């Protein structure tokens, strides 16, 4: 009798496990409330990112918390992986999105309208250097001050990296293929002989691209650059405390605004190296009736 009960229990557990493994979220259904289909979850990235803070504000300002919407912390890689899997089966998903980023080139995505302007207007990505860099390393200062490119330029490098190319190799390829643009950063800059320079960055795809490219440009005038990835707050602190020489990863005025304010007076802002960046919530274009953050609310 005991043996029969154990066998029955094992079979029941096996059936349950197989059923669970075979369960996947259904394709998007425009006739049903979105929240119910994705457990009222927005798929996000690193907890300290400015877009995550803005999204927490969006949940409150649009009263999404009334429906118990939540923001799931992960990483950029995990978020894009989840997005890719969802879109393969045309499942519903809401993610924190920003441009420039390769996901907007590779996938058919759209930003949700933000009528309350919680995410702010278009952002620019600034170059920030430590105080005294102009005097200590004038050639590096000049290259960093000259560094400017477009969202399309950045996307080229990001797509290469996403396809498996090493970031340094992708940067070298872009430098080789764009001599006229690079010349605008390096022409007239006095060369050095192996002087060291340290750049820090947050490990977002966009900043991996820009930091590796500017490091290659610095090599062209004789520098030996070191680049180090870290979280966003330590990145700002590294420049403000002279632990690093600079970074090209300051999304302003929104994403990095809090850190700009916290460390103001302890760094030099060289201005934008890329204009027209944007952050917000994004969904696949096949979610045709979800066009605004307000559309996330449960229908009454």
Swiss-Prot record:
Q: Which CDD domains match?
A: PBP2_OpuAC_like
The domain of life is Bacteria
As given in the record, the signal peptide range reads 1-20
Alphabetized GO MF terms: amine transmembrane transporter activity; carnitine transmembrane transporter activity
- Annotated GO biological process: amino acid transport; carnitine transport; choline transport; glycine betaine transport; response to cold; response to osmotic stress
Q: Entry's Pfam families?
A: OpuAC
Taken from the UniProt entry, a GO cellular component term is: ATP-binding cassette (ABC) transporter complex
The UniProt function text for this chain reads: Part of the ABC transporter complex GbuABC involved in glycine betaine uptake. Involved, with BetL and OpuC, in osmoprotection and cryoprotection of Listeria. Can also uptake carnitine when carnitine is abundant in the growth medium.
Lipid-modified residues of type S-diacylglycerol cysteine are 21
The record, for InterPro entries, names: ABC_Gly_betaine_transp_sub-bd (IPR007210)
Covalent lipid sites (N-palmitoyl cysteine): 21
**What is the annotated quaternary arrangement, including any partners?**
The complex is composed of two ATP-binding proteins (GbuA), two transmembrane proteins (GbuB) and a solute-binding protein (GbuC).
> What is the protein's major site of localization?
membrane
Task: Write down the Gene3D superfamilies for this protein, in alphabetical order.
Answer: Dipeptide-binding Protein, Domain 3, Glycine betaine-binding periplasmic protein, domain 2
Q: How is its activity regulated?
A: The complex is activated by an osmotic gradient or by low temperature.
Which protein are we looking at? Glycine betaine/carnitine transport binding protein GbuC
Q: Where in the cell is it found?
A: Cell membrane
Provide the alphabetized UniProt keywords: Amino-acid transport, Cell membrane, Lipoprotein, Membrane, Palmitate, Signal, Stress response, Transport
Native species: Listeria monocytogenes serotype 1/2a (strain 10403S)
- Give the way it sits in the membrane: Lipid-anchor
């Amino acid at each position: 009798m005991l043996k029969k009960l154990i066998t029955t229990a094992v079979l029941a557990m096996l059936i349950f496990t197989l059923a669970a493994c075979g369960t996947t979220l259904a394709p998007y259904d425009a006739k049903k409330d979105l929240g119910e289909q994705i457990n009222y979850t927005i798929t996000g990235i690193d907890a300290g990112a400015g877009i995550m803070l803005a999204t927490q504000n969006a949940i409150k300002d649009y009263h999404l918390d009334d429906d118990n919407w939540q923001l799931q912390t992960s990483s950029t890689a995990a978020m894009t992986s989840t997005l890719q899997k969802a879109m393969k089966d045309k499942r519903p998903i809401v993610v924190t999105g920003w441009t420039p980023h390769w996901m907007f080139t590779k996938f058919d995505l759209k930003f949700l309208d933000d009528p309350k302007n919680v995410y702010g207007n278009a952002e620019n990505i600034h170059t920030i250097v430590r105080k005294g860099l102009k005097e200590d390393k004038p050639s590096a200062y000049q290259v960093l001050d000259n560094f400017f490119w477009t969202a399309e330029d950045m996307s080229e490098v990001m797509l290469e990296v996403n396809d498996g190319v090493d970031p340094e190799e992708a940067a070298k390829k872009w430098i080789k293929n764009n001599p006229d643009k690079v010349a605008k950063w390096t022409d007239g800059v006095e060369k050095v002989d192996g002087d060291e320079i340290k750049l820090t960055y947050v490990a977002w795809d966009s900043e991996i691209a820009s930091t590796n490219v500017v490091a290659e440009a610095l090599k062209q005038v004789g520098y030996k650059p070191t680049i180090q990835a870290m979280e966003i707050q330590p990145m700002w602190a590294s420049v403000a405390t002279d632990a690093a020489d600079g970074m090209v990863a300051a999304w302003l005025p929104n994403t990095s605004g809090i850190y700009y304010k916290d460390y103001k007076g302890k760094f030099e802002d060289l201005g934008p190296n890329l204009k027209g960046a944007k952050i917000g919530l994004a969904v696949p274009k096949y979610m045709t009736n979800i066009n605004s953050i307000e559309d996330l609310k449960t229908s009454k």
